[in-house]
Structure formats: C-alpha cells, structure tokens
Amino acid sequence: MMRAMWEALAALAAVSCLVGAVRGGPGLSMFAGQAAQPDPCSDENGHPRRCIPDFVNAAFGKDVRVSSTCGRPPARYCVVSERGEERLRSCHLCNASDPKKAHPPAFLTDLNNPHNLTCWQSENYLQFPHNVTLTLSLGKKFEVTYVSLQFCSPRPESMAIYKSMDYGRTWVPFQFYSTQCRKMYNRPHRAPITKQNEQEAVCTDSHTDMRPLSGGLIAFSTLDGRPSAHDFDNSPVLQDWVTATDIRVAFSRLHTFGDENEDDSELARDSYFYAVSDLQVGGRCKCNGHAARCVRDRDDSLVCDCRHNTAGPECDRCKPFHYDRPWQRATAREANECVACNCNLHARRCRFNMELYKLSGRKSGGVCLNCRHNTAGRHCHYCKEGYFRDLGKPITHRKACKACDCHPVGAAGKTCNQTTGQCPCKDGVTGVTCNRCAKGYQQSRSPIAPCIKIPVAPPTTAASSVEEPEDCDSYCKASKGKLKINMKKYCKKDYAVQIHILKADKAGDWWKFTVNIISVYKQGASRIRRGDQNLWIRSRDIACKCPKIKPLKKYLLLGNAEDSPDQSGIVADKSSLVIQWRDTWARRLRKFQQREKKEL
C-alpha cells in the first residue's frame, strides 16, 4: 500500500514539474485567445491579497553533488533478494563509461518511472565512519514541506538530512534517522517536540528497517508534529525552520546481515551500498506571500516575480519609495503590501521612521527626502522658507509654491506668510512684498528705517515761537545772502554733515530737532553716524536766527563738538555754519575730505 501511495505521489510531482517547466512557454500560444486568468495576487475588487507560487518538486532536473558513485573504475555489485529464508545474490557490473551500466547522480532527480527505475549508486561498502553525501542546491530560498528518498537498496541504518539557508556556507540539521540515535548523533531517541524546541532536529528510528530490500521510502515532513504548524503565518520560528537554499543527505551506516566478515566476505561486502532511485524536495519558492511565481532574471537566477510593491529575491523588502510602513510577510488575513510614501509628487526618495510610525498609530512612517519644487516638510506638504502657497494650484502641482520676493530693504526677513504671501515689513513700510512706504511715511536713505514719519509742521517756525531779544545784533550776526564753502571753513569745524530737519520740540532752554543725517563729510571724536539723531540748539540762538533753521528742509551743518543736554546727538550754536543744502556741494565736500586725509 505504501508503495502505491509513493508511486502516486511521485507521478503527481513529476507532472507538476513538467507543467511548471512549460508554463508561459510557446506551448501555451494555442490558448492565447482565451480569457485572462484572474490575478492570484489581487481579489475581484483589485485589492491586494496573499499569493504563493505553485507547489513543486524543487529537486526535479537539478544537479546533485555526490561524494561517491560506483563505476570509476568498473566494479562488481550484488543485489540481494530473499526467497523464504533463503538469501540470493545477483551480481552485476557498474561501469560509469557504459550508459547502460552506469548509475550517475542524474538518476536521482530525473523523471521517476516506477516501471523503469533508474538508480544512483555509491561505491561498495562505505561503512561508518565513512559517510556518503548527496548535496542539492535549490538555486534560491524555498519553503520546504518534505524531503523524500526512494531506495533501490535497503534503507540506511543511520542517515541525516541537513539544510543550508546561505547557499551552502553553513549547515544545520533537519532530521536524523538511526536505530542508535545517542551513539550516532548524540541525540535522544524520539525526543518530544515542544514550542521551545520546535526549530530543532529530532532523531527517530522510523523508516530504518532493513526491509524491504528494495523500494523502501524515507519521507521527512518539516512541519509534522511541530506545535505551531497550525498557526504558521504567525510563527517566524517555523517560517525560518522550513526555509532552505540547499539540502544535504548524509548516509552514515549501512544495514548488513552480519556476514561481511565471514569467509566469503568479499561477495557479502559487494552487496552493501547505497542506491536511490528518486530524491524529491517538495515545497514552494519562498516569496513571503507577495508573488505567485518565480522566474529567471537577467543573470539566470531564480527570483520571485514580486507584487504588492515588494522587491528582492524573496520579496523580502519594500521596493524603493514604498516605505510608508515596514515590510511584513503576507498572511491569509492581510496582504501587508508596501505603501508608497506621500510626498505630493515632489520627491523621488523617502525613508522609514519607526518613531513616527508608532506616533501615527502604526499607519504612516514615511519621511520624504530632497523635496523638490521649493517644498519642504515630511510629506513635502508646505513651501520652504522664502516661498508661499499658490492656493490656485493643488499642492501636487510643480508650481504650487511661489517666491515671496520680499523687498531686500523694506522687509524684516525673507520668510513670508505661507498662506497670503505677506512679507514681514519694517516700521512704516507696507505692501505684500514691503516695497513702499505706508500712508503718513516718506522714504529715507536709511536701510535700517527706509520709511520715516512725515513730520507735522508747527504753525510758526521755531524762531517765531521765541521773542527776539533786543540785543541780537550784539549777541550774534545772522547770516545774510549766500555763503560760500571753502577749505578754510571746512578745516575750522569739528564736523560737517548733511541733515534733513524732521521736527522741532521745545525742551527748556533748548530746542531739540529730530534730524536725519544723510551724509557725514567730517566727524570728530563723537563718531557721528548716518540715520536719525537729535540736534540741540539753544533757544536764544534760535531766537536770534543764529543759525536760521526751518523744518522739512535740508542743510549743510558745520559745527564744533559740544556736550548735548541728554548726552546724545549733536549740538549747534551761533558759531555753527548752517547753509541750505545744494547737491553741487557733495562733490566739493568729498574733495575737502580727501585733501584733509592726505595732509594728516
């Protein structure tokens, strides 16, 4: 009965392999006109769902590396059969050079025909401690369901199955078979499997009987008896346990009748060898639920045909720009597809941030990198400094952000309101870009205060508010007519400045004029600077028109350094020279300034 079941399994696996080999090839062109098959990775509504590659015999047609094969040189071997209690031997020649008498490793993974068995065979009597190994490379990671071997010889007394997850660099045990588990593999016999050790190999004496002498089967199920097998989707331990890139079978001890040391021991020893008609590794290409098939890439390597925005040989990572949530294996309940970062079409790269993902309630963790089109932010969702949103365009538009264009002098900074585009204006400046003076202000030459208040002229001049003393003629001599500026006058004074009278206020015995110093042609120890300052003149000097000053006018002021009443500003008196400004004087005063520097 077991033999019949095995034959059915082998035939099914062979047919599956043949179908898989021709899938997608020219042989299907005759069906091109038929309706397209439903997408296994999406449901009827187009939503992602788990998909897995077909179950196959991953060993079919693949090369197997063996440590021993008979026939080099040609050698005799004898097949033992039993008739009642009588033991018969039929001897033959194994010759690797003769295809009809050869038993190469290719027979392990060819199409298994029960009516025409082909068997790989080892050299005779390679007994413990000498091993015979079969090593099969699957070409990529597979999730292995079973490993089976059908024998042409008696089954081994002891053998082990190993797996590699790193293409043969390291090996871990998968299963041990022996009648002497402790002696051969230092393992307990049929140790119980619990959740704590379900990822470990066990040793059993099942399938180790010598009989049948031919046609015996050893089949190892990777999940049989493992406690978490019923919840495989949620068991990373078992998912790792069934994963393999390579399978190795190590035959450790031959079964014998105990006659190998008798008189005709040579004949007996020629009867003991390992011979296998079929090696199968049943499983699926490992794609973590994100692919329905495996294909050959440009390098002829077997890789998953990844879906759900995943990438990698096993669809084990998210493809670029799909990092809004962490990669996860698909399950029967959730496809766990990778999600694109939300960058509003302004970025081509992003990264995943676990902290942000947790803060969002495990919904979004993508952070956009190198936002373009003058955008900024985690999602490129606002305009960078110096730009504001054009509400007439969607945020995904290439020109969703407009330049603020804040005036370099009138604005207090380059950043404008993200919604209105209003720049931060300095005092007295207005306009969206701060490009003009507000009402009641006039432009100045100061980059610090480009707009100043327009002073309200008093009903009378400063001089008319003070009664002129009777002795003005003896006190000072008011200037009359036009005055000339020469180098002598320039040199006699401590400072020479161009001023603009803004307003005048009475302060006890003084008049305080708010002036804007437009240009400085000479300065003393007080280090006069351009901009708004106070000009102090005694009331008696103003009353005698020494000097004569009117608000809102521009003057050339040459005077001597004196202490002002409030220790700020400059002082003018009857000896100061105050002349209404002429633009032609600027060049002459610069010459005076240069000549004075040369003479120093």
Curated annotation (Swiss-Prot):
GO biological process, one term: Cdc42 protein signal transduction
Domain Laminin EGF-like, residue spans: 285-340, 341-403, 404-453
Keywords: Apoptosis, Cytoplasm, Disulfide bond, Glycoprotein, Laminin EGF-like domain, Repeat, Secreted, Signal
Domain NTR: 472-600
Residues covered by the Laminin N-terminal domain: 47-284
Cystine crosslinks: 119-152, 285-294, 287-304, 306-315, 318-338, 341-350, 343-368, 371-380, 383-401, 404-416, 406-423, 425-434, 437-451, 472-544
GO CC term (a single one): basement membrane
Positions bearing carbohydrate: 95, 116, 131, 417
Signal peptide extent: 1-24
Motif Cell attachment site, residue numbers: 530-532
PANTHER family: NETRIN-1, NETRIN/LAMININ-RELATED
Quaternary context: Binds to its receptors; DCC, UNC5A, UNC5B, UNC5C and probably UNC5D. Binds to its receptor; DSCAM. Interacts with APP.
Chain's role: Netrins control guidance of CNS commissural axons and peripheral motor axons. Its association with either DCC or some UNC5 receptors will lead to axon attraction or repulsion, respectively. Binding to UNC5C might cause dissociation of UNC5C from polymerized TUBB3 in microtubules and thereby lead to increased microtubule dynamics and axon repulsion. Involved in dorsal root ganglion axon projection towards the spinal cord. It also serves as a survival factor via its association with its receptors which prevent the initiation of apoptosis.
Name under which the protein is recorded: Netrin-1
Species, as recorded: Sus scrofa (Pig)
Gene that specifies this protein: NTN1
